[in-house]
Amino acid sequence: MLSIFQKKYFLVDLLEGFTDFHNHLLPGIDDGANSAEDSIAMIKKFNEFGVTNFVASPHVMGEFYPNTPETIFPALEKVKKNLPHGNSIKAAGEYMMDQYLIDQLEKNNVLNVAENCVLVEMSYFQAPINLAEILFKIQNTNLKPILAHPERYAFYHDSSFDKYKDLKTRGCDFQLNMLSLTPHYGTGIQKKAFQLLERGMIDFISSDAHRMEHLEKIGNIKLKKKQLNLLEPIIEKSKALFK
């Protein structure tokens, strides 16, 4: 899928052996796949990119999606029943940093996205007032927070990058959304994504795919050689997270 004439490269050509650990493949428990049939169709699309390993990460937020292992694992089993041969799928969560997360941490009820790592997110309107406390509680349970799509939090879009640096100082790794490499979420978010990449602040990348439309767009992402060079080590580090 190399585009010789445009001197650009398809992102998906780098994904062989990649584990997609931020997606909404599990049916009926958040704003992702509606049915197991939708889940399997999305997995087959991923397979076209060379991706056969998944950690499903449904939203976990007290107000809208109060998921627990008791709701997540039955949804996982629905997918496993018809999982195409050669694929593997596990379940975790994308945890809103709210009181519900604190409660789940205290109950030892949090599903890790990788060994000792928990995928977290914030509201798109503002950071939680008790952000420092939540990050401390996460790490106090011997978990490493991976912040989903930091490029999408507009309240951090100042020129100094100090707020991002503070999160790094507090122990957060950053996970970039693939679609943030395009104007899908807006040109401001696309710009911030590349700025974070250029500053070496991104640790991992994943799809955050909610539906087939997202995967079709990911399949069409083309990169310049300079952009490719920025992303290659991020993709390799993402692969290494699951070795």
Give the predicted meaning of each segment.
Residues 1-86:
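An N-terminally biased module of ancient metal coordination in phosphate/nucleic-acid-related enzymes
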Residues 2, 66-173:
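Extended substrate/RNA-proximal surfaces in nucleic-acid metabolism proteins
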Residues 4, 219-243:
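Mid-to-C-terminal alpha-helical segments outside catalytic/metal-binding sites
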Residues 8-28, 160-178, 182, 234-241:
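Mobile, glycine- and charge-enriched loop segments
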Residues 19-23, 54-56, 89-93, 118-120, ...:
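Hydrophobic faces of well-ordered beta-strands that scaffold small-molecule active sites
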Residues 24-26, 59-60, 92-98, 123-125, ...:
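Active-site beta-loop-alpha junctions enriched in small/polar residues
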Residues 47, 139, 197-198:
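Non-catalytic positions within long, well-ordered alpha-helices that form the structural scaffold/packing
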Residues 202-217:
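Short acidic/histidine-rich active-site segments
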